[in-house]
């Protein structure tokens, strides 16, 4: 048997090592010029006026919700089929997450479902660009504008995703992730883009103790060392060590995503003859970033359950992932919302499985996964 093939592996090389070495030798290793360069590069990528680097996408979600003054008595619409950090941040601020169902085959929330969930207490809508494909964001933003509700795009899967010719986040507010399995990574990190100048100013304060400037800003421009606290804030800044890695990865983005796309196409061609169901692609014009390649394993159709398939693949050295278990089935949220029923979400949550997909995979690696799936399907 070949060595273990993980579900994901970061694509790191000599360029990232050199970038880290440069920062370590510079004398300034925390938030500084590499953060500024990363923010500028993201504005060029998405076309937004402002970018705010943070220590994680979760941190970005937290301070974005705070900056929008979301709290007790407010409701925030979000799919249940998402990572629980979004639900956690909403709940920790005292607001109520209103979990809605997704399309059965794209796993993304639809404008119709969002609009049906709006009440006088709705303060924000958080659509997820799932697995690297874009949600129908124009239609969702139109709903937000019509009702006066903020739209926060969960773009954790969407670095390199385009919707109708525009990069995700363009002309809106979106939060990206640089976690270890994402399309670009710096181990841990995130970034918010927005065209709202007041929101950007609030985010910069909230990410760094509520100060109007950070330490590098004071050091560079010779401002008074005793900075003023303008509002209570957090310690969510990104170090320049991390920013340097993310910046180097961003330069490679087109190459990294091209390789992901090639592997995804290899899977798609093979799955056409197998009972495992991949996700459907959105109907609107888009460029898929292929953050994840997800199949649905229905036991009646496939002759094997999802959990049994994942275990069988593990036994022959192939890793898989689960993105995601529905949040409303987690203990805390199950007890808080005991009567909530989301049929499409629940059907998929019990069947989805993420196959290995990362830029350093070889064609032989993908063939190995395909052969294993063929054998497990009895072919």
From Swiss-Prot:
E.C. numbers: 2.6.1.87
Gene3D superfamilies per the UniProt record, alphabetical: Aspartate Aminotransferase, domain 1, Type I PLP-dependent aspartate aminotransferase-like (Major domain)
EC class (word): transferase
Catalysed transformations (reactions): UDP-4-amino-4-deoxy-beta-L-arabinose + 2-oxoglutarate = UDP-beta-L-threo-pentopyranos-4-ulose + L-glutamate
Family: Belongs to the DegT/DnrJ/EryC1 family. ArnB subfamily.
PANTHER family from the UniProt entry: TRANSAMINASE, UDP-4-AMINO-4-DEOXY-L-ARABINOSE--OXOGLUTARATE AMINOTRANSFERASE
SUBUNIT field: Homodimer.
Identification of the protein by name: UDP-4-amino-4-deoxy-L-arabinose--oxoglutarate aminotransferase
Native source organism of the sequence: Escherichia coli O127:H6 (strain E2348/69 / EPEC)
């Amino acid at each position: 048997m070949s060595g273990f093939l993980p579900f994901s592996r970061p694509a790191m090389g000599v360029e990232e090592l050199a970038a880290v070495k440069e920062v370590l030798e510079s004398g300034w290793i925390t938030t500084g010029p590499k953060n500024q360069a990363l923010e500028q590069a993201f504005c060029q990528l998405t076309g937004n006026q402002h970018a705010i680097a943070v220590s994680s996408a979760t941190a970005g979600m937290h301070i974005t919700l705070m900056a929008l003054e979301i709290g007790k008595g407010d409701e925030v619409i979000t799919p249940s089929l998402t990572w629980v950090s979004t639900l956690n941040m909403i709940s920790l601020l005292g607001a109520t997450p209103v979990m809605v169902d997704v399309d059965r085959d794209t796993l993304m929330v639809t404008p119709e479902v969002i609009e049906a969930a709006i009440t006088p207490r709705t303060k924000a809508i958080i659509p997820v660009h799932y697995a690297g494909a874009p949600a129908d964001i124009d239609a969702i933003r139109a709903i937000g504008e019509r009702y006066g509700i903020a739209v926060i795009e969960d773009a954790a899967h969407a670095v390199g995703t385009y919707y109708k010719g525009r990069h995700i986040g363009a002309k809106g507010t979106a939060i990206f992730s640089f976690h270890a399995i994402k399309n670009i990574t710096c181990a841990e990190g995130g970034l918010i883009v927005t065209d709202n100048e007041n929101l950007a100013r609030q985010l910069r304060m909230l990410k760094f103790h509520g100060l109007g400037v950070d330490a590098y800003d004071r050091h560079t421009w010779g401002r008074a060392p005793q900075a003023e606290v303008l509002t209570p804030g957090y310690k969510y800044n990104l170090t320049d060590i991390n920013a340097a890695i993310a910046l180097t990865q961003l330069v490679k983005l087109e190459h990294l995503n091209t390789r992901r796309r090639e592997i995804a196409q290899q899977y798609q061609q093979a799955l056409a003859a197998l009972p495992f169901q991949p996700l459907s692609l959105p109907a609107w014009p888009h460029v898929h970033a292929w953050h994840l390649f997800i199949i649905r394993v229905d036991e009646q159709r496939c002759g094997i359950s999802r959990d049994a398939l994942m275990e069988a693949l593990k036994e022959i050295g192939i890793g898989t992932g689960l993105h995601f278990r529905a949040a409303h089935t987690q203990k805390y949220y199950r007890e808080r919302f005991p009567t909530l029923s989301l049929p499409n979400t629940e059907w998929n949550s019990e069947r989805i499985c993420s196959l290995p997909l990362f830029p350093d995979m070889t064609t032989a690696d993908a063939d190995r996964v395909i052969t294993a799936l063929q054998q497990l399907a009895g072919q």
